[in-house]
């Protein structure tokens, strides 16, 4: 997705490092679900080398290191502070590479490549898939979670700002030349908050703000709060926020 400012994203996530683990409720659920799917898919796979793209502070890393503790792992994240935190879960030989996963010249080959809640930030997800295919042999597994249209839809409907999320059809097209799709499953995760301001606080503390600070003025915040309550209040008076994750697993073709 063109136009994404990765330096701005890196700064946001760096600021959110200390609060992310406490606030990222949806992402934690996604990691738990993803670990279950991955365990089934890789049951007969011998994993000697593995790469995690966008490891963040290690929410998925912790599961992965327990599941594939004998593998030589490479951990990557755009944010240097995050990957340093994630590396605390390392159980064996672990290589740490911070930087833009779309620009890094990957030279090693990996039996398993995984990513949780990261590729939605990529400018060219189709090119990223081709790059991953180049560092996997036949039978290698690529497993990732990302988000579909409908994610943070409440924010977008009011502010007209947010990411343009690819559809499952987009992902199938991009994968088709390189991988056989093993799994594509999606779900909806709905969080509730006391107030619309708590929604914005949640997004800020997880680094996934859909709007920049420069967008907000006092009057805009007031208008946002009124609109959010009107449109997205639950019967108990709380307000909702929707995530629409998808889990994708595929096997490298010949």
Feature locations, PLM:
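Conserved alpha-helix/loop element of class I SAM-dependent methyltransferases that forms part
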Residues: 26-46
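A short glycine-rich, Lys/Arg-flanked "PGG" loop and its adjoining helix->strand segment in the class I
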Residues: 126-138
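Class I SAM-dependent methyltransferase SAM/SAH-binding core
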Residues: 49-104
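N-terminal, positively charged/glycine-rich alpha-helical extensions of SAM-dependent methyltransferases
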Residues: 1-19
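Conserved class I S-adenosyl-L-methionine
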Residues: 143-168
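Conserved Class I S-adenosyl-L-methionine
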Residues: 23-26, 59, 164-166, 183-254
């Amino acid at each position: 997705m063109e136009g994404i400012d990765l330096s701005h994203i890196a700064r946001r996530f760096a600021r959110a490092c200390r609060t992310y683990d406490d606030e990222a409720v949806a992402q934690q659920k996604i990691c738990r679900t993803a670990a279950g799917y991955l365990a089934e898919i890789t049951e007969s796979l011998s994993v000697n080398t593995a790469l995690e793209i966008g490891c963040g502070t290690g929410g998925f890393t912790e599961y992965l290191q327990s599941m594939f503790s004998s593998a030589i792992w490479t951990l990557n994240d755009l944010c240097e502070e995050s990957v340093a935190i994630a590396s605390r879960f390392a159980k064996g030989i672990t290589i740490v590479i911070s930087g833009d996963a779309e620009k890094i010249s990957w030279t090693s080959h990996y039996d398993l490549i995984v990513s949780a809640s990261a590729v939605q930030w990529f400018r060219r997800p189709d090119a990223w898939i081709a790059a991953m295919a180049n560092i996997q042999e036949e039978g290698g597994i690529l497993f990732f979670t990302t988000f579909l249209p409908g994610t943070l839809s409440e924010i977008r409907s009011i502010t007209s700002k947010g990411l343009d999320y690819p559809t499952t059809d987009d992902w199938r097209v991009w994968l088709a030349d390189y991988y056989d799709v093993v799994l594509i499953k999606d779900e909806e995760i709905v969080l509730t908050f006391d107030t619309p301001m708590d929604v914005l606080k949640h997004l800020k503390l997880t680094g996934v703000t859909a709007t920049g600070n420069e967008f907000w003025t006092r009057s805009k915040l007031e208008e946002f709060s009124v609109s959010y309550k009107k449109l997205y209040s639950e019967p108990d008076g709380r307000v909702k926020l929707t995530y629409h994750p998808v889990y994708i697993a595929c096997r490298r073709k010949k």
